[in-house]
Amino acid sequence: SLVGSEMCIRDRIHSGDSACSLPPVSIKPFLIKEIENQTKKLALALKVKGFMNVQYAIKKDQIYVIEVNPRASRTVPFVSKAKNLPLAKIASRVMAGEKLSKFNLKSKTKDMFAVKESVFPFNKFPNSDLLLGPEMKSTGEVMGFDKNFGMAFAKSQIAASNSLPIKGLAFISLKNSHKEEGVELAKQLVKLNFKLCGTGGTADYISQHGIQCKKINKVNQGSPHIVDVLNAKKIALVINTGGGNSETQLSDAVALR
């Protein structure tokens, strides 16, 4: 019996800090079928009884196996609640010799979306760096549940105490490789009644596509800069994928976070 969820996370970040959707929302159907096929082959080859946890990565429709563990994972409680099935109990009984076919494994929450979100302690440690990495930083998990994916995601953010503004000034700072996607994002924010501002390159790129976006200085460009505006509580939403390897870029990124 297979249950597949989709993690939303960058590479080189601990999987325990991920957001997670069940069922997957952006993986192509033929890739899901291939993942199911590969997982069955792995389970049979390894002769696993009970849980088997497999982590896959997908890039350009190519599937990569990251790791295979013959054990449960931290997503079992989330998946059990999402499917309304006692998966840990079933797996334990299978390990003890009972047949999997004995159990009714049909989901009791059909046509529902479940979103798991990680909870971070950054509010209690104001000087800590928000940047995620290989070391797990989250201290808990919450879950959003709804017939609509967007609403399920919103519920998960509210439960994790992540504010969801509905209007105001949105600040955008994007890597060059993200700017094309950022135009569509900017259009959606404007439709939601947000005003836009951004660092020089991002603001110029968005403005070139007919969307009004006010330019704000980076920290290294002098006051008034983005941190001044943030400290003045004038920003409702921050979307930042910027960064870089130079000392100035790293310093700006740390100051913004």
Predicted regions and their residues:
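C-terminal accessory/binding modules appended to enzymatic or scaffolding proteins
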Residues: 132, 136-151, 155-158, 164-201, ...
